[in-house]
């Protein structure tokens, strides 16, 4: 009987792990934020007045993905697939942008959405 208990315990443990794994795989993965729908509205509210058609602070235009990838005086604003190494995220994270006198900071939720958007662009140059 004692030899049977470890076997029974192992079987129960394996079946529990299999169920947890199956549930995790069934969970829908959050979709990557969309530039037009999710990202651009934030930029329009908080960035484009200084980085758009009329003004291009640092020679950076934030109205299109292509312009962000091209960047401005300091190089590309984004490193696709790596938000942590993207200048845009660094400047927002340390609250260097937007400037205090120019308007509201990007919220923590917006910053996280921007990180997810950049990280989802892996493989894009």
What are these model-derived regions, one by one?
Residues 1-4:
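Positively charged n-region of N-terminal signal peptides that target proteins for export
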Residues 6-16:
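Bacterial N-terminal signal peptides
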């Amino acid at each position: 009987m004692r030899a049977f208990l470890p076997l029974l315990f192992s079987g129960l443990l394996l079946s529990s792990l299999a169920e947890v794994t199956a549930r995790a795989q069934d969970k829908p993965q959050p979709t990557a934020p969309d530039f037009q729908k999710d990202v651009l509205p934030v930029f329009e509210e908080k960035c484009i007045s200084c980085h758009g058609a009329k003004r291009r602070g640092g020679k950076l235009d934030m109205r299109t993905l292509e312009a962000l990838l091209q960047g401005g005086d300091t190089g590309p604003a984004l490193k696709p697939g790596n938000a942590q190494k993207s200048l845009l995220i660094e400047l927002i994270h340390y609250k260097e942008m937007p400037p205090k006198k120019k308007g509201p900071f990007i919220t923590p939720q917006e910053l996280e959405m921007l990180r997810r958007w950049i990280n989802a662009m892996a493989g894009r140059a």
